[in-house]
Amino acid sequence: MRLVERHIIKKNHRFYAEIDRLCFLSKNLYNYANYLVRQSFIFENTYRNYHDIQKTLQSQLDYQAMPAKVSQQVLMILDRNWISFKESNLAYKESPSKFKGRPALPGYKHKIKGRNVVVYTAQAIRKKQFKRGIINPSKTEIYLKTKVDTSNKTCSWRGNLAELPCSKIKQVRLVPRLNHYIIEVIYEADQQQYELEENRYASIDIGLNNLATLTFNQAGIKPLLINGRPLKSINQYYNKVKSELQSLLGENKSSQKLRKLCNKREFKINDYLHKASRLIIDTLINKKIGTLIIGHNTDWKQKINLGKRNNQNFVFIPYNKLIEMLSYKAEMVGIKVIFTEEYYTSKASFLDNDPIPVYQKGKKIK
C-alpha cells in the first residue's frame, strides 16, 4: 500500500521561496486550463478532457514554465476534479436528497494569494541524487533527505526480469497550506507479516472523554482505554484564543496569529492521533488479534445533540482521521478491518450474542 512521508516547510526554511514560486506557477496553469474547460462547458455544453487541453496548452507560457511532466500532472488534477463534478452532478439529478447542496463547478484559485499543488512523478526526480537517499525534483534546487528505501532493485516487466531501478517512491508533492508548505513523499510500503489469528476479534468504540475504547472477544484480556481529554483540552484552548483574536479582528477577517493557532492545533491533534492509533495497533499485534471492528455512523457530527459545550468538543475532533489512521496501519500488518453501524449497539448484548440490526431509512409513524 502507499504511505506518505511529510516534511513541513515554514517561511524561514531555505526551500520556501522556491516552493512558493512553483506552486504559484502551478496555480497559473490550473486557472488558465480551468477557464478553457468552464467556457466550453457553460457556453457549448461540451467537456474538454485532459488530452484535449494538454494538446492545446503545450505551447502556452504557463505550461512551459514548469517541466512537461509536472505541467501534465496539474492538468490531470484538473481533469479529475471535473470528472468528480460530473459524476456528482449526475448523482444529484438522480437523487438530490443524498446531497447537502447542488455540486458546484470546479472554481478558480485566487489570482494573487492562490497556490496549487505541484506533483513530481518518479520519472521527474533526479536519479543521481536519488541513489544517495536524497529527493531532488527535476530543475529545482530542492534537496531533501528521505527515510524511504531508495536502493535499486530489479523489476518484472511483462514477465521478464529487466535490469531497471524499481523505486518504492511514486510521487513527490508540494502541497500549499495556510502559511507553510508540506513536501509529501509518496511511497509503496510492503505489508509486514505477523502471527495473527483472524478469529480473535477486537472492537473499537469512539467517544469523547475516552477517545477510543478497545475491547476483545478473548477472556482475560483487559480493555484498553485511550484518553480523549488531551484533545478536548487542545480544542478548548483553540476555541478560547480564536474567539479572543476574532473579537479584535471581526468575524470575516484573519491574521497571522490566527493562522499560526490553526496550524498549532492541527499539528498537536495529528500527533496525538498518530500515537493513539499506533498504541492500538501494537496492542492488537501483541494480543495476536487478526480482526478489528470499528463502529462508525454516517453524519454523526451533523445530527449529534449532546448540548452546546459537548457538541463543540465532539464536532471539532477529527474522528474520521483516527479511523483512517487505524485502517491503513492495520492493513500494513495484515489485520482485517470491519466497519459497522453503531446506532443500535447500546440495545444489543455482546455476552448474550444479540445480533446488531441494521434498518433502512424510513418515516417515523406515530
Regions found by a protein language model. Give the residues of each.
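Nucleic-acid substrate recognition interfaces
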Residues: 1-366
